[in-house]
UniProtKB/Swiss-Prot annotation:
Binding site for S-adenosyl-L-methionine: Q215, F245, E267, D313
UniProt cross-references to SUPFAM superfamilies, sorted A to Z: Nucleic acid-binding proteins (SSF50249), S-adenosyl-L-methionine-dependent methyltransferases (SSF53335)
Disulfide partners: none
PANTHER family linked to this entry: RNA M5U METHYLTRANSFERASE, TRNA (URACIL(54)-C(5))-METHYLTRANSFERASE
Annotated keywords: 4Fe-4S, Iron, Iron-sulfur, Metal-binding, Methyltransferase, S-adenosyl-L-methionine, Transferase
Keyword Transferase on entry: yes
Name listed for the protein in its UniProt record: Uncharacterized RNA methyltransferase NE1857
GO BP annotations listed: rRNA base methylation
MF GO annotations: 4 iron, 4 sulfur cluster binding; metal ion binding; rRNA (uridine-C5-)-methyltransferase activity
Organism ancestry: Bacteria, Pseudomonadati, Pseudomonadota, Betaproteobacteria, Nitrosomonadales
PROSITE patterns on file: SAM_MT_RNA_M5U, TRMA_1, TRMA_2
Source organism, top-level taxon: Bacteria
Active site: C340 (nucleophile)
Gene3D superfamilies: 2.40.50.1070, Nucleic acid-binding proteins, Vaccinia Virus protein VP39
C-alpha cells in the first residue's frame, strides 16, 4: 500500500517523517530529508495504540533543496546496503541545522523553555571525510564489512571515505586475508568482529578484541579538550576533582594539567584503567567502579563528598540514576558534562536544574559528519540556597 506525501521534519533518530494524507498517521522513512516529496510504501503497520509506523521511499517526486548525491557508492537504505552515514544525502549546513534541532527538541521535551537557552551554532568538523580514527568491521570469513541496518547481513565494503588514511589502509590489509577459514564464526554466531584504530597495527589480526574507548574524530576531540581546559581555568582551582567515565584518560590528561593535588578518576573498564595508570599523570588516582550500580553514589560518597569539581563523559545512557547523587557530592560547585546523546543529556540537565544547578555554557559539536550524532559540552554551577526539594531521583 503506497501513498504520496512530503517529509516535514526528522525524528530524534534522524529519520524523515511523513504524514499519511488519509489516516493521519506519521511514518518514519530512512534516506529522506525535509522537503523531499515522494511516493512511500508502508512497511510496518501501525498498532492501535501507536500513532506512527515505518515506510520506505519508492519514488522521489521532488527533491529537497538540501538533497545531494552521496559521495559513497555503498550507501543505501535497503537490507543489503551500508547505511552508516545516512545523512550523506544532504548538504553539510543542513546537517548541522538538523543536529541542533535534535538537541533543542530533546531539551524542550523535558521541560526547558527554548527562549532561555542561548545555543550557538554547532561546532563543525574541519573534515567531512577522512576524519574517523577507529572502526569496527564484521566478518564471516567470506565477507568483511559493516552490518546493514536492522539486519544480520554483512555488507561487503571495499573502501570507506570517512576513515582516515591509516584506517583506510587497515581496511585494505584486512581484505587481503579473504577468504579466511580462521575468521569463520563459531556455531550459533553470525560473525566475528575486528576492532582497529589508527594507533594499532592491522596485523596480527585479533578477532573479537575490543579497543579501549577513544573519541573517533581527532580534530573535534582536541576542540573538546581545549574547551575543558578553558572551563577548568575559568572556574577556579579545587583541592579535589572527580572524573566519572574517564576511559583511558583522554580528558584526565587535561584535568591533570590544572595542578590539582587530588584527582579521582573512575571507569568500569579495567583495561582502560590499566592504560590510564601507565600514563603516570600527576595527582591522578585511577580506580575501577561500576558506575551504573544501583547504589553507586552511596558506594562512592566517602571518597567524593568533598570534591569541588566533577567532570563526566558518560556513554549514551547518561547518568541513568541520580538518586543519592546530590547527597554524595555535597561540596560540589562545578560540573563539566560531556555528552554524546541529547535525550539523556536533557534528562540529566533537567534534574540538575531542579536541584539548584544552572548551566552557564552549552556547546554542540559535530564529531561524526553525515550521521545524526551530536556531541554536547556543558558547564553547570551550583546555586547555593536554591535547591528544590523532591527532585533527587
Amino acid at each position: 500500500m503506497s501513498f504520496q506525501g512530503e517529509i516535514t521534519h526528522l525524528s530524534q533518530k534522524g529519520l524523515g517523517v511523513v504524514q499519511h494524507p488519509e489516516n493521519g498517521l506519521s511514518y518514519f522513512v530512512a534516506g529522506t530529508w525535509p522537503g523531499d516529496r515522494g511516493e512511500f510504501e508502508i512497511t510496518d503497520r501501525a498498532l492501535n495504540n501507536r500513532k506512527y509506523g515505518y515506510a520506505r521511499l519508492i519514488r522521489l517526486i521532488q527533491s529537497s533543496r538540501h538533497r545531494k548525491t552521496p559521495e559513497c557508492r555503498f550507501l543505501g537504505f535497503s537490507g543489503n546496503d551500508c547505511s552508516g552515514c545516512p545523512w550523506m544525502i544532504a548538504d553539510y549546513d543542513s546537517q548541522l541545522e538538523q543536529k541542533k534541532n535534535r538537541f533543542l527538541y530533546a531539551m524542550h521535551r523535558v521541560g526547558f523553555d527554548l527562549a532561555d537557552l542561548n545555543i550557538g551554532a554547532v561546532q563543525p568538523s574541519p573534515d567531512l571525510f577522512g576524519y574517523r580514527n577507529r572502526f569496527q568491521v564484521k566478518t564471516d570469513g567470506e565477507k568483511l564489512g559493516f552490518v546493514a541496518e536492522g539486519s544480520h547481513h554483512i555488507v561487503p565494503i571495499e573502501d570507506c571515505l570517512i576513515l582516515n588514511p591509516a584506517c583506510r589502509q587497515h581496511l585494505q590489509t584486512l581484505r587481503k586475508h579473504l577468504p579466511s577459514r580462521e575468521w569463520s564464526p563459531a556455531p550459533g554466531d553470525d560473525w566475528n568482529f575486528i576492532d582497529l584504530d589508527d594507533q594499532s597495527p592491522a596485523e596480527p589480526v585479533l578477532l573479537n578484541w575490543k579497543q579501549p574507548f577513544r573519541q573517533g574524530n581527532d580534530a573535534q576531540n582536541q576542540w573538546m579538550r581545549s574547551w575543558l581546559k578553558y572551563a577548568l581555568e575559568q572556574h577556579g582551582h579545587s583541592h579535589k576533582i572527580v572524573e566519572l567515565f574517564c576511559g583511558s584518560g583522554n580528558f584526565t590528561e587535561v584535568i591533570a594539567q590544572t595542578g590539582c593535588p587530588e584527582i579521582l578518576a573512575y571507569e568500569a573498564d579495567p583495561q582502560a584503567i590499566t592504560v590510564l595508570r601507565q600514563k603516570n599523570l600527576p595527582g591522578v588516582d585511577a580506580r575501577t567502579a561500576d558506575l551504573y550500580h544501583p547504589f553507586i553514589w552511596k558506594i562512592l560518597k566517602k571518597n567524593v563528598q568533598d570534591a569541588g569539581i566533577l567532570v563526566l563523559d558518560p556513554p549514551r545512557s547518561g547518568l541513568k540514576t541520580l538518586r543519592g547523587f546530590f547527597d554524595a557530592f555535597a561540596a560540589l560547585e562545578t560540573i563539566c558534562y560531556i555528552s554524546c546523546d541529547p535525550v539523556t543529556f536533557a534528562r540529566d540537565a533537567w534534574i540538575f536544574c531542579k536541584n539548584g544547578w544552572k548551566f552557564t555554557d552549552i556547546q554542540l559539536i559535530d564529531l561524526f559528519p553525515h550521521t545524526p550524532h551530536i556531541e554536547i559540552t556543558a558547564t553547570f554551577h551550583k546555586q547555593w540556597g536554591n535547591t528544590k526539594k523532591g527532585n533527587k531521583r
